[in-house]
């Protein structure tokens, strides 16, 4: 799933996406050397990593799951606390950096799990050979507003690859939508679709063409 804080930051700051990379994620359960998995009482990691290992963690329902900023900090905490009742959901690399032992390997629910990272700049750069577009816009709380929004992709034969919604602060039942679709800003079909999207929604922003 998406990391919601990233969407919020894209809106807050005038940054632009210029690239993306997909990195395979293989998390472990790691603890202090000499720890037995039966000793574990508390597990630390970022929320997304805990969710990605929900099946494994669910088999140990008595463990307390505690969220921290990221998986590396979780591993660092285990080292600093020196408590064998604690473990971290983290990569094998993070475990090795902080001198932890892997108690269980490949604990992700999805064995082909990966994370998409975006490359951003504060310059308004749209690459000429780009093939993907990211936008965001706001929709009013009105009947069929989302249907009309999506119709512009179908009408212009554009392949939408992702859509996520975030509630708008201070506006009940109104949402900001983040959409990825294939194309280049120079394409006539893309220009026509964006023209229609501006009419359907509010505050449309092109986040990147990469």
Over which residues does each language-model region extend?
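Domain-level signature for soluble enzymes in the chorismate/prephenate branch of the shikimate pathway
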Residues: 1-210
């Amino acid at each position: 799933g998406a990391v919601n804080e990233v969407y919020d930051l894209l809106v807050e700051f005038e940054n632009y996406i210029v690239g993306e990379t997909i990195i395979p994620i293989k998390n472990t359960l790691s603890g202090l050397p000499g720890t037995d998995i039966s000793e574990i009482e508390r597990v630390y990691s970022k929320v997304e990593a805990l969710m990605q290992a929900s099946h494994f963690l669910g088999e140990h329902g008595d463990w307390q799951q505690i969220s921290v900023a990221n998986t590396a900090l979780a591993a660092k905490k285990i080292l600093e606390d020196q408590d064998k009742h604690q473990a971290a959901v983290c990569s094998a690399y993070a475990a090795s950096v902080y001198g932890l032992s892997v108690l269980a390997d490949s604990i992700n629910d999805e064995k082909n799990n990966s994370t998409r990272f975006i490359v951003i700049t504060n310059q308004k750069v749209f690459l000429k050979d780009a093939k993907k577009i990211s936008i965001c816009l706001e929709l009013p709380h009105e009947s069929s507003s989302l249907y009309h929004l999506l119709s512009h992709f179908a009408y212009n034969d554009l392949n939408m690859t992702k859509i996520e919604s975030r509630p708008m602060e201070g506006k009940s039942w109104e949402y900001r939508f983040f959409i990825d679709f294939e194309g280049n800003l120079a394409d006539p079909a893309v220009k026509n679709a964006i023209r229609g999207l501006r009419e359907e929604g509010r505050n449309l922003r092109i986040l990147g063409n990469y």
